[in-house]
Amino acid sequence: MSDKKRINQIAKETGLSNTELVATAQSLGFEVKSHSSSVTAEQAEKIIQGVKTGTDTIVKPAEKTVKAKIKTVPETAKSKQEDHPRTFAGKAVVEDPAILARIKEKEEAKKAAKTEAEPIEEVITTEKPKVAEPVKKSEPKAAAKAEETKVEKVEAKAKTVTPKAEVKTENVADKKEPVVTEEKKKSLTQKPRIQIKVIKRAEDIKKEQAAARPEKKKFDKNRNDRNNRNDNRRPNQNGNGQGHSQGGNHYDKNRPAGQGQNQGQKRDKFASSGSSSTSDTFTPAASGKNNRRDRDRKKTDSNRDNTKDGNRKGGPLRVNDNRNQVRNARNSNWNQKGGRGRYQNNQSSSVPATQRKFHELPESLEYEVGMNVQDIAKSIKREPAEIIKKLFMMGTMVNQNQSLDEDTIELILMDYGVTPLKKVEEDKSDIERLFVEDGYLNEDKMVERPAVVTIMGHVDHGKTTLLDRFRESRVTEGEAGGITQHIGAYQIKTNGKKITFLDTPGHEAFTSMRARGASVTDITILVVAADDGVMPQTIEAINHSKAAGVPIIVAINKIDKPGANPQRVTQELTEHGVFPVAWDPENGSEFVEISAKFNQNLEELLDTVLLVAEVQELKADPSVRAIGTVVEARLDQGKGAIATLLVQQGTLHIQDPIVVGNTYGRVRTMTNDLGRRIKEAGPSTPIELTGLSDVPQAGDHFAVFEDEKAARAAGEERAKRAQLIKRQNTRRVNLDNLFDTLKEGQTKSVNIIIKADVQGSAEALAASLQKIEVEGVKVDIVHSAVGAISESDISLAAASNAIIIGFNVRPTGLAREQAAQEEVDIRLHSIIYKVIEEVETAMRGMLDPEFKEEIIGEAIVRETFNVSKVGTIAGFMVIRGKVTRDASVRVIREGVVIHDGAIASLKHFKDDVKEVGNAQEGGLMVEDFNDVEIDDTFEVYKMVEIERKK
């Protein structure tokens, strides 16, 4: 043998394990790190001797803690077999007196340690050990194992702790070297704790527990029963003499069920009762019982065991125990439900398997027409079958998916005691209501907006020149290209404020906007030439402005001409209801004398516009979603639908979902009147946009929606409604249906447009018609002028739903065509009292259409045929004219009319025909008349309406 040997060589020679040798060498103070470390022969002998004889002779430094000693003191199966007496049938077999002497010394040291452990605050318990046989007093091996369950922290008494750590042994038949976990380290360092073993007899422990047990709330009965059953079924397998119940007590077959739990929960009651070495069982006790009791209430068994040393000792058993408890609980629930099939428990359970939750009925329910039973059941928290049953008892057979009418829904809700409330659906596609209602506007965010001005007047009075001067005034010299495009509306800035002008060449666009109820104009500038005076179109412009209800600013143009006479123009305008402010301060209009050609007094005209706008207090809310009106629209080959819009409320942004008239889309691009792209447009701002699905019409309203889906739905709905209205016959007011219209309450006044040959006749006719008053309905003269009936008159009549009276005048050819398209009623007269009588008769409902009889044919009966269940069919020959199916027939016999009625059927040979011509044969049957004879004459005629004389 060499001077030094490795630990693994020594293990092979002696048959000992490397772990035991390394642990013993380290406990002797040798520098040994692993089984590959080398020691001298002398050290090897000491190590072998130390393993065989134990570690009693090993002297440890007094300053080392128990924590370190636990790590460095190994236990081997071989040393245990040598140091502890073997047992047979519960009795110790003593083989070596030296071993008995050492055991006795250990017991004395243990007693001394227990008596000195006075300042103890809390017990540090180990995990539940495996089940073992009961420990007897005479068994030193069991006493030594009892020392294994103690983890102690000694503050200043190393002399009493050292022997404990040296004699502490462990059964390593199933487990390896003990390892102190981090949790145990943490618990050792938090508070000065020490474990006390109170060894008593089982009978004494039971008595003390019964006496010291306080009143407490019981745990769940099912849980305790399951735990007790598991404890009774599972044998004690731990070799250290401790059971795996909550208290860690020894398992006793004779003790009552649940005693282990009670002992574990109440071990603090008998912890201070002293110690005894003559008991068959032992129970760890603890101080700080209140904290312990709180933890027992809050933590489950598995959590408390795992926080201690579950991975070392009691962990696997506790996991299995938890799994068994879960399985037992599931089986218990299964048994309560009754099992499955023929193996189910026949005993009836007191608690039903499924218990329906009760829901209170609502006090009221807002319903929609067309709801089915399933919808109602979901709303009132009831089963559909229950509602179907109620309806069946009421005599109504329905299923849960069948739609119900309003009466049935209210009946079933009232039967349940629920107040039915019909839901009022808001038509989101009706964007016109936004122009009538202003409840959505925020008064706190209202700001001043620019005025919208329309220039109207006779075409030869300088309207176009005035528009050009305004355009030139807002274009600076630095702009390249000047005005690049004309979009029908533009803005100018004067005195720090903006004015929006609408370019409306002619009155067609303005009239169409009025017809759609879109009055976007705030102020009208009426241009009148100073040398010509008031012309027919000037009067028409005045009537348009008054019908729109907007103030008028009169611009007397061409004052630079030699024949200009502004005073005469003022006098003529007063005859048509336009008075200067000096004459009528309340309802008067501003008069400004200008010269558009020489830019004379244009600034004064703009200042007047700003003054009138300030008086009107024009405001808008830019924070809401934008609404407005279409000025004009067109279809571009490259860009698609292009619309010129005027924003009236809110702010329009790029990518806004928008509905324009009967179209929809998303704002793709926006261009202002200068041709520049912008990202947003505020109130009274004209813009040109792209992105619509179709070309809208001038005068249509537009509105921004919350999302594109809602905009699409609203646009499609509006297009569908427009198509439906287009298919229906538009009912215009005329003298024939005027009484019915008045009766239905659709009209409270008769709108009339008068066109006469001379001004005197027009004035006299207007005065006479305004005196007619029937049943509270009066005549309203919309427009009265001199001249032929023109297209403008037709447009005005269509917009105002008026009747045109022509006195000694005729309509033009284009006017007739437009009147037929617009379905405008034109009445032509030459006698004034005839006009008054006809209008009054129409208002009273006395005007009936006149008809005359027109004979279209004559036939002679040649043969008759009697057909059962049909009647008599007469075969005839047409001798003059023709016989038609939709005509009436007189049966004449010997010059006397014996019957007058309609033709029921008409045939040519065997074919049904609509007409039989001259010199042709056919057969007919007279409706409700069968007494037809040969040689009777058929006189065929029609009733034709007579056109009234003009």
Swiss-Prot record:
Residues 482-486 are annotated as: G2. Residues 557-560 are annotated as: G4. Residues 457-464 are annotated as: G1. Residues 503-506 are annotated as: G3. Keywords: Cytoplasm, GTP-binding, Initiation factor, Nucleotide-binding, Protein biosynthesis. Residues 595-597 are annotated as: G5. The keyword Aminoacyl-tRNA synthetase does not apply. Residues 128-354 are annotated as: Disordered. One of its GO terms (cellular component) is cytosol. GO terms for molecular function: GTP binding; GTPase activity; translation initiation factor activity. It comes from the Bacteria. GTP binds at residues 457-464, 503-507, 557-560. Residues 128-158, 165-186, 200-234, 291-312 have a biased composition (Basic and acidic residues). The keyword Amino-acid biosynthesis does not apply. InterPro entries: EF-G-like_DII, IF2_II, IF2_N, P-loop_NTPase, Small_GTP-bd, T_Tr_GTP-bd_dom, TF_IF2_bacterial-like, TIF_IF2. Residues 322-336, 343-353 have a biased composition (Polar residues). Signal peptide: none annotated. It is found in: Cytoplasm. Residues 448-619 form the tr-type G domain. One of the essential components for the initiation of protein synthesis. Protects formylmethionyl-tRNA from spontaneous hydrolysis and promotes its binding to the 30S ribosomal subunits. Also involved in the hydrolysis of GTP during the formation of the 70S ribosomal complex. Belongs to the TRAFAC class translation factor GTPase superfamily. Classic translation factor GTPase family. IF-2 subfamily. This is Translation initiation factor IF-2. It comes from Lactococcus lactis subsp. cremoris (strain MG1363). The lineage of its organism: Bacteria, Bacillati, Bacillota, Bacilli, Lactobacillales. The gene is infB.
